[in-house]
Amino acid sequence: MYDVIVVGAGWCGLAAAKTYLQTCPTARLLVVDGDSSIGGTWSKERLYPHLVAEAHYGLFEFSDLPMRREGILPDGRIPSAAVHAYLTEYATKFGLLPRIRLNTWIEDIRQDPTAIGDDKAPYWTLQVAGSSQPLQARKLIIATGLTSEPRMPSFPGREDFEGHVLHSKMMGRADTGKLLNDPSIRHVVVYGGSKSAFDAVYLLLRAGKTVDWVIREGGGGPSIMTPLNILGQPSFRLNNSRVMSLFSPNPFEVAGERSWWQRVMHQRAGTFAQLLVVWFWRVLAYLLQRPWKYDYSVNGKQLKPILGLDSVLWSPATLGVMTHPTLWEDIHSGERVTIRRQNITALGQNKHVVLSNGDRITADMVVCATGWHARHSLFTPDEQLAVGLPSTSSFDPKSQAHWLNLQKAADEEILEEFPLLQNCPIALPPVRCEDDHHLYRFVAPSSGPLAQERLIAYVGFLRTTGAPIVYEAQSLWATAYLTGALHVPALEEREKEVARTNAWIRRRYICGRKVPFALFDFLPYVDMLYRDLGVNSRRKKNAVSE
């Protein structure tokens, strides 16, 4: 019986395990991961040639271990191997390696109320794939994040397709490497418009392949790709500054204690203040998009953000850093890559890929850069609801009515508090309350027996661009929560807060309607976590430095 099991050995899991052990050094703690090496997204089996981190050197590290300069590219880009080496060094420095069990894929997690340990406390049972011996723990930290379960489209005719079909997650596998070097694999279709699609296209072109890049019509469009540098600084540094959150209406400050800026620019925003905020984001969008010259070619036009200069403000698609700017030369030349805004409707014989306009493409391989599942198969659908996760299952009628009422009230409150959010150009679709993450502070279940007994916490379940900064704060909050050292408000207040933050995300970020998202607001979120803990998160000597 373990005191704590951490599921996931990437950035989130390592931060969570280290933080918990520093607080409780005698705890029996185990970290499990299904891969054969640590790193999560940056594990060895998920690395492939030319894969580079979006963050610049110095902006992708934990606060207690600087990243070594060895292996860093001259312009400050961080190759994937350097990220993996850094995480290995981190796990070594803090004594985590002996506590990590790799090649351990968790199939199912259950918390049986009748299962009581020797200390009369309930415990979790984790079923390991290929093993008849389950793992048991008193408490859990789920640190798999939001990019662990690939979303694979279900293509009609897949069984008749003679080519290869794989998710972009598999690009680093040895068998995928063999396909890249196979001269019989000449033509590849890449499906999707995310940052991983840009990376896949670049890799395939460097491997000598011809690419048809198909981006789904009717979705959020291609990712908004930022240049490596903006105004002489790494673009990631700008996004990691408080300047961005100044112009982004967010709910993370204490009600009644908001800064004069938040009150004037967002809460009481008149026409002039709203115009100022909108034009800040439009100027930024112009600076981000100008280097790519979208209108220069037919291909380039297919990659234009769907909301133009308003795309950064409302984020219909995720933001990415163009880690390989020379890809634009290939895009504009159109010699070996063709970009299409269509849906793939079917696969078929003779290696045919059928598009929604009736066109047929012959392809030896299809790479699906189609993102990740928001639901987590570690738990059954009913258990997903109990632990605060989205689910295809439904609440009982009473709970459903309760959450729908909270949802409606929270949406009205957010729109009244932040008038700018009433102007989102894409209407909010109907929302099931079961599709939300019901996690207080995006870390702990908001309600139910599990919340009362503090048996489970999450790290990495809010998508941001400030990964290490956020994971450290979440890990400390989760540790304090699980050990009973953190005061949390009463049930009613927690549930209102969860409904409120979910409503804000849906209104603030169009792409946040799929997963929890705080692109430009993660520093106020981190401030909030540390405020809960009684820690001052503003430690620089003046407001300008902050």
UniProtKB/Swiss-Prot annotation:
Q: In which organism is this protein found?
A: Pyrenophora dematioidea
SUPFAM superfamilies, alphabetized: FAD/NAD(P)-binding domain (SSF51905)
Q: Which Gene3D superfamilies match?
A: FAD/NAD(P)-binding domain (3.50.50.60)
**rRNA-binding listed as a keyword:** no
EC number(s) reported in the record: 1.-.-.-
Q: Where is the signal peptide?
A: 1-17
Q: Which family does it belong to?
A: Belongs to the FAD-binding monooxygenase family.
The pathway to which it is assigned is: Antifungal biosynthesis
Keyword terms: FAD, Flavoprotein, Glycoprotein, Monooxygenase, Oxidoreductase, Signal
Q: Does the keyword Glycoprotein apply?
A: yes
Sugar attachment sites are: N239, N343
This protein's name: FAD-dependent monooxygenase
Q: Name one Pfam family in it.
A: Pyr_redox_3
Role according to the record: FAD-dependent monooxygenase; part of the gene cluster that mediates the biosynthesis of the tetrahydropyranyl antifungal agent lanomycin that acts as an inhibitor of CYP51 and blocks the ergosterol biosynthesis.
Positions that bind FAD: I106
Cofactor(s) recorded in Swiss-Prot or TrEMBL? FAD
| Top enzyme category | oxidoreductase
Q: Which InterPro entries match?
A: FAD/NAD-bd_sf, FMO-like
